[in-house]
A protein has these predicted regions:
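A short beta-strand-loop structural module common to alpha/beta enzyme folds
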Residues: 30-39
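N-terminal small/glycine-rich loop or linker at the start of catalytic domains
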Residues: 1-10, 56-67, 99-103, 142
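Active-site-adjacent beta->alpha loops and helix N-cap segments on the catalytic face
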Residues: 38-50, 105
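Conserved beta-strand positions in the central sheet of alpha/beta enzyme cores
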Residues: 33, 58-60, 96, 134, ...
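Active-site acidic/histidine proton-transfer and metal-coordination neighborhood
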Residues: 66, 70-168, 178
Length: 254
């Protein structure tokens, strides 16, 4: 059965993070996740996760949206070392990394080589700490105009060149629906490279029911691959938050 994780950045936004964690646990979810770790009360988050006995499925590298940057490798490596310390303290094994936006004054291949170099340096730190980096393609048509990494095959090309078991892909089923669709075929073909999933309904980035994706079929396909990681819910609810998250949970439990 697919294991769902709740991205607490998107839900109960008026509440402290520790209260959000408690509510995720009360609904019966098996894990939670969040984005960046800076400017958060990590002690309170750790206490809340331990009280709820709830694993942290993923968090983002600091600095994020940065793997494309020029002359940034030392900063990225240092940021990954700091992120690894936080992840170890919180018991998190999966680190989300986004790439950043296109440089208009250089060719695709020059950019690609730098992204691979920067990502490989960060992945080496992750590998040394028993962590996995998941590179996330995003959509450029609605949410992230100018973002460089947009398609699954492009991400596969990068992680294959890095050639480390600590280099994987975050397959976001909202972003990929917008950019190329073909969700089930792609996730089935690339599952050995996928280390995490995100979900949201399209259009709108809202609930999983009512959009153009059939998440029951998608979850069945993920399950059929033998994938043992988490599928993160990263959407903006239009319903009451508790009602919305109960609805999402019913897709894997009902």
């Amino acid at each position: 059965m697919v294991k769902l994780s709740v991205c607490i950045e998107m839900f109960w936004r008026d509440l402290p993070y520790e209260e959000r964690i408690a509510r995720v646990a009360a609904l019966g979810y098996p894990a939670f996740e969040f984005w960046g770790w800076k400017n958060k009360d990590l002690g309170a988050i750790k206490a809340a996760k331990e009280k709820a006995n709830l694993p942290l499925a993923a968090l983002c590298i600091e600095p994020n949206f940065s793997l494309i940057r020029r002359n940034a490798q030392a900063e990225l490596v240092q940021g990954m070392k700091e992120t690894a310390f936080v992840a170890r303290d919180l018991g998190c094994k999966t680190i989300i990394a986004t790439v950043g936006n296109v440089y208009d004054d250089e060719t695709y291949e020059i950019t690609r080589r730098r992204v691979v170099r920067n990502a490989a340096a960060v992945v080496k730190v992750a590998e040394d700490h028993g962590l996995t980096i998941v590179l996330e393609p995003l959509n450029t048509l609605v949410d992230h105009h100018g973002y460089w990494l947009t398609r699954m095959a492009q991400a596969v090309d990068i992680v294959e060149e890095i050639g480390s078991p600590a280099a994987k892909i975050l397959d976001d089923l909202y972003h990929q629906q917008i950019m190329e669709g073909n969700l089930i075929n792609n996730l089935s073909a690339y599952i050995s490279h996928i280390g995490h999933f995100h979900t949201a309904g399209n259009p709108g980035r809202h609930e999983l029911l009512g959009g153009e994706q059939d998440f029951r079929a998608i979850f069945k396909a993920i399950d059929a691959t033998g994938y043992a990681g988490y599928v993160g819910l990263e959407y903006s609810p239009t319903l009451d938050t508790t009602v919305s998250l109960k609805q999402a949970l019913s897709l894997v439990e009902g």
